[in-house]
C-alpha cells in the first residue's frame, strides 16, 4: 500500500450520546478548509455491514470470500470478514490506509488506545465531570461548560477553535 509514513492519529473519545459524530461532521470540513486531508477510523460496538443484501458483492462475500473489494469510479471499499478474530487494534487499521492521501487520521472511539485524544464532555448528557478519564494521552477536553483540568479546555461548540487547536497540535507533531 502506498504512503506508509507515520502520520498523526488523533482520537475523539466520549460516552455514547455526547456528540462525537456530530462534532466530527463539522470538524472535518473545517480541517479541509485549512488544507488538511483527514482520514477517519470509526469504532462501533454494533455488527455492521457496508454492503446490502441482494447485491452481487454481498452474495459473493456471504458465499465465503474472506475479503471483498467493491469498486466504482467514485470510491472503493475493502471488507474483511473477522468473525473469529479478536478485536483489531487501531495501529493495524491505520496501516490499511493510504497515508499518501492523508495528513491526519481522526479516530472516533478507541478510547483505551494509547494515542493522543480529545475527550468530549457535555453537561446534561448523563455523566459528571468527575467521571472523565484524563490520562497522559489526553491533550484536551472539549466541553460546553467550564471545567478545572490540567489539560487544555476547548469549547465543544467552537468548531473553528477546535480546528485551529488540531492544526497547531499537528504542527507540533511534525516538529
From Swiss-Prot:
Keywords carried by this UniProt record: GTP-binding, Molybdenum cofactor biosynthesis, Nucleotide-binding
Gene3D superfamilies: P-loop containing nucleotide triphosphate hydrolases
Lineage: superkingdom: Bacteria
Gene Ontology biological process terms in this record: Mo-molybdopterin cofactor biosynthetic process
Entry annotated with the keyword GTP-binding: yes
Induction, as annotated: Is expressed at very low levels under both aerobic and anaerobic growth conditions.
Keyword Heme (UniProt): no
GO function terms (MF aspect): GTP binding; protein homodimerization activity
Annotated binding of GTP, by residue: 17-21, 51-54, 100-103
InterPro entries reported in the protein's UniProt record: MGD_biosynthesis_adapter (IPR052539), MobB_dom (IPR004435), P-loop_NTPase (IPR027417)
Self-association state and partner proteins as the record states: Homodimer. Interacts with MobA, MogA and MoeA in vivo.
Role noted for this protein: GTP-binding protein that is not required for the biosynthesis of Mo-molybdopterin guanine dinucleotide (Mo-MGD) cofactor, and not necessary for the formation of active molybdoenzymes using this form of molybdenum cofactor. May act as an adapter protein to achieve the efficient biosynthesis and utilization of MGD. Displays a weak intrinsic GTPase activity. Is also able to bind the nucleotides ATP, TTP and GDP, but with lower affinity than GTP.
Family statement: Belongs to the MobB family.
PANTHER family listed in its UniProt record: MOLYBDOPTERIN-GUANINE DINUCLEOTIDE BIOSYNTHESIS ADAPTER PROTEIN, MOLYBDOPTERIN-GUANINE DINUCLEOTIDE BIOSYNTHESIS ADAPTER PROTEIN-RELATED
Protein name: Molybdopterin-guanine dinucleotide biosynthesis adapter protein
